Amino acid sequence: MVRYIILFLFLFETLQKSDVFFTKTINSSNMVKMFQKLNLNLKGRVGLKVHTGEQGGKYFLRPSFLQEIYDYTNGTFIECNTAYSGMRHSTDLHKQLLQQHGWLDNNRRTVIMDEDPSADFTLTINHPVKISENIVGAHLKDFDSCIVLSHLKGHGMGGYGGALKQLSIGFASQAGKAWIHSAGKTRNWKQAFQGTSQMDFTSAMGDAASSIVEYFRNKGGIAFINVMVNISKSCDCAGGRAPEPKIHDMGILASTDPVAIDRACLDMIVKNTDVGTMELLQQIQRLEGENTIDVAEKHGIGSQEYNLIDIDKEENINKSPNDNISFKEAIYNFGE
């Protein structure tokens, strides 16, 4: 009898966790294979959220790499303008960069969602921690479902960049980015980076991310694919200034849970022993990067408890944060 109770509890706990699929093999066809593993029927017009890469950047996910998932879903690449100077700051310059980076080659469908800033609209954030609304581009309304395609790497402001960063800063319009960076103080990008605490900023990111997930879950569905390749401590926003990656390529992860997929990626980095690991972990800790995950989880859009399923072995590794070393322990142990 006791054996059956233990088995029941184990199965119940496993069912409460989100599935995160993983493969070590990074190629275009595996982007499709990983999406197929989710067994998710996305409805209507599918947006493929990407980072189009700042000028001079070498590490962003290239449109040629994403071609197969683009073809398979009959999707449209979607992106927004930025809240800092650079070629993605204005729609006209951003369109030039799209051409330079190949996003418009072969008649690829690529849309700048906030190309007309005057047409921005707001999404209400339920039970906000820091901000009660999210400002997004008008073309978001053109899409019924979405796959968020994220290059997992460090980030000089958020600590790291993954699915939740794409959902928050990535989906926000230029005014929305200023709103998040300032934790709800201003929509003016020139005033957005003045005196906001990291906890307030990362909390605002978690708030904003929740509104996008709820928006698509209430329409045609949403999925997430993180690619752990060229893992630099800097974001693709840094362009040519991004330092060389010091962490080896790890693989592709996919999930319907943005909290679980980002948590799984960070757990993999924690257990890594490459020379750049400690520097990235310290950055994430210093910039309160994990707070974004915590706030997103509080919103109920996902869980930090997950089952990591290695599709190369078809093995459920069954990992969760309770089994993992903390950031502080990892940094300490790495220095031993």
Stretches found by the model and what they are:
Residues L7-F10, K43:
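A general, composition-driven signal for non-globular sequence regions
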Residues L9-S18:
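Bacterial Sec-dependent signal peptides at the C-terminal "C-region" and cleavage site
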Residues M1-L7:
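Sec-dependent signal peptide recognition
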Residues K17-Y72, T76-E336:
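Extended, low-polarity segments enriched in aliphatic/aromatic residues
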